[in-house]
Amino acid sequence: MQFTLHKTAAGESRARRGTVTVNHGEIRTPAFMPVGTYGTVKGMLPRDIEDIGADIILGNTFHLWLRPGTEVIDKFGGLHQFMNWNKPILTDSGGFQVFSLGAMRKITEEGVAFKSPIDGAKVFLSPEKSMQIQYSLNSDIVMQFDECTPYPATYSEAQKSLELSLRWGQRCVDEHKKLGNTNALFGIVQGSMYEDLRRQSMDGLLEIGFDGYAIGGLSVGEPKEEMISVLNYMPELMPADKPRYLMGVGKPEDILEAVRRGVDMFDCVMPTRNARNGHYFVTGNEDNQGIVRIRNSQYREDQGPLDPECDCYCCQNFSRAYLYHLNKCKEMLGAQLATIHNLRYYQRLMQGIRDAIDEDRFDEFVADFYHRRGQDVPPLELK
């Protein structure tokens, strides 16, 4: 893997424009990765994902391991061939899903034992096993197996958790090398909301050495102010010559605020999940949050396009009234068109960010984003 930093934004922000080059192609950063949990982005053909401009998608190690299983995907030569996607894939390690099982799992130094949510069978996932699964998937970017620290966490709980994740991180690197895996491996910073613990985690990861670094443990229920507080210092602790990935954060305004603070990569289920609930992200300020809730009766006879500024298939071909009708009838096409639009909105947002950095007008882009929503630009309180 290679990361090329092309430009840092003019002005007070730390926004960066770069390219991540992996075995299956290039990823323009800042980048948003659509989530394809089971080897598919819900409601989207692979060609649809290409059409909306995505350079990379995210797959889920945990779910693909349980179903269909690596023994099936191995027969196809990896996840790319299995799902017919020829661009880059990042897979998470399975850690977040395992730890979300709550009482169904038991954590030890060796790994995590749990009952399969599919059939109740006893299953064990370790750092080594996570690396082996992701090797079978042939992910372009592999994530270390870590303990996702819950929120809230006491200082001692957060410290114990990050220290376990560091030990697991070393085991991931060792197994990754043992397998001869030439794909990239990213480490994950933990430490909850405690700055000194975040610094301790980052120092430990740097000592181990990874191809890129991710900020974990955010978007887990904490107030936005606490998330921003972590982002005010965290990206600056990460190497400038490596990609910086913020895991699971996906509101458009949160992505923009993270970019202002130096983050390069993002993923979230929000655009696809919200699409299935009739929430469309739009360029304007429909509700001061840039969202059209298409099930509202005001759209029943609305002949206008969903977003006049959007070039997606949905906006170019259908009215708000038709989308309202599809949602009221619970037609599958409604969710599909919403997904196409929302993912295109996110890719247009990222392209706009990249262009603005390239053209030395990023601060103006940020101001326009908030102006359209009738909001002031939040202050930058960088450390």
UniProtKB/Swiss-Prot annotation:
Positions of region (RNA binding): 248-254, 272-276
Cofactor(s) listed: Zn(2+)
Gene Ontology MF term list: metal ion binding; tRNA-guanosine(34) queuine transglycosylase activity
Binding locations of Zn(2+): 310, 312, 315, 341
Keyword Transferase annotated: yes
GO BP terms in the entry: queuosine biosynthetic process; tRNA wobble guanine modification; tRNA-guanine transglycosylation
Substrates-to-products reaction catalysed: 7-aminomethyl-7-carbaguanine + guanosine(34) in tRNA = 7-aminomethyl-7-carbaguanosine(34) in tRNA + guanine
GO cellular component: cytosol
Alphabetic keyword roster: Glycosyltransferase, Metal-binding, Queuosine biosynthesis, Transferase, tRNA processing, Zinc
Cross-referenced InterPro entries: ArchSynthase1/Queuine_TRR, TGT, TGT-like_sf, tRNA_ribo_trans-like
Keyword Translocase attributed: no
Binding of substrate, residues: 92-96, 146, 190, 217
Cofactor binding, per record: Binds 1 zinc ion per subunit.
Enzyme Commission code(s) on record: 2.4.2.29
Pathway, per record: tRNA modification; tRNA-queuosine biosynthesis
Active site: 92 (proton acceptor), 267 (nucleophile)
Subunit structure: Homodimer. Within each dimer, one monomer is responsible for RNA recognition and catalysis, while the other monomer binds to the replacement base PreQ1.
General function of this protein: Catalyzes the base-exchange of a guanine (G) residue with the queuine precursor 7-aminomethyl-7-deazaguanine (PreQ1) at position 34 (anticodon wobble position) in tRNAs with GU(N) anticodons (tRNA-Asp, -Asn, -His and -Tyr). Catalysis occurs through a double-displacement mechanism. The nucleophile active site attacks the C1' of nucleotide 34 to detach the guanine base from the RNA, forming a covalent enzyme-RNA intermediate. The proton acceptor active site deprotonates the incoming PreQ1, allowing a nucleophilic attack on the C1' of the ribose to form the product.
Record-stated family: Belongs to the queuine tRNA-ribosyltransferase family.
PANTHER family associated with the record: QUEUINE TRNA-RIBOSYLTRANSFERASE
Name of the protein in question: Queuine tRNA-ribosyltransferase
Gene name in the database record: tgt
